[in-house]
Amino acid sequence: MKIKLIFYFLILISLVACNEKKNEIDPDLLLSVALLQPPDRAENYDRDVQIITHTPQGFPVDCDLSYSDEDVNFFAERLKREIARYPRGYWIKAAAENIVLCRNLTILGNLQAGAVNPLLPFIFLSVPDGIASDANRQVFNGSTYVNFLDYYYNYDPRRVISHELTHSVDRRNSWHTLFDPEWEGLNHPGFQYGNHNYNPQDTSINILSISNSIPGFVSYYATTNHLEDRAEIGMVIMGPQTVNNQLVRLCQTDAIVAAKVRKTVSEWKAFWPFAGAENTEWKLRITQAERDCG
């Protein structure tokens, strides 16, 4: 969890270093830089997302490539389906142009389910062992048999994909990836991220499970920091259907969660204001979220 923040702190350090003479900023230079930016049009992002497999990565990413063909092919196909749920170009604008698939993905030696490169348009995702066979399994949920990934949704690739894409939209959308007082102001007065109010050694607690055990949050993991809080809200909106089905209940019972959902949807609509998204699942999900949490 803390490893992801290292990427962002590296950016912050570079910004501080570049602004040592902060009182000598040339406004004409800033205007010139702004004019160099291309217009924000959908056609600027009209290209395919690249799914990268069997390709080593450099420090600080350790990308194990020993996944089975069955697992990596299944994950890649599931990823293609996820990309197709969004308007064409959405992932490109989100700086998620390259998706690297690894087995046992590690960042600085720490295992990660996924990670975003804050400087380059890359997302790294870990392919779980046996994911292809798990997708065809049926398990008993207490009353009937259901698909393994529907019941154990934390193993569903759609969970980590939607979570990491939210991270990528956030860091592309604005600098609130570093500081976000407006978001933090939605929490209960006095709340501090990192004080989870639970024992991390208690293995009976699944920090990724969707629950409202801590008011204002959709999972224990969301209480880690504002970045993970935002990503978990995005995941509930766009993640597995089993998770999304809980959105109405969460919003009806928790005004803070409802406010976070509304803020996220508003930001996403501003991020992708272009025509042509009407028939995408992304549009359907955010429209439903507005109704459920309005």
What are these regions (language model features)?
Residues 15-53, 289, 293:
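Bacterial Sec-dependent N-terminal signal peptides
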Residues 31-33, 76, 80, 265, ...:
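Residue-level detector of alpha-helical secondary structure
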Residues 103-111, 115-117, 122-294:
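Active-site-flanking segments in enzyme catalytic domains
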Residues 54-64, 240-241:
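Beta-strand-rich recognition domains
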Residues 59-138:
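Auxiliary, metal-adjacent structural segments of Zn-dependent hydrolase domains
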Residues 12, 57, 286-287:
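Processing junctions and N-termini across compartments
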Residues 1-16:
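Sec-dependent bacterial lipoprotein signal peptides
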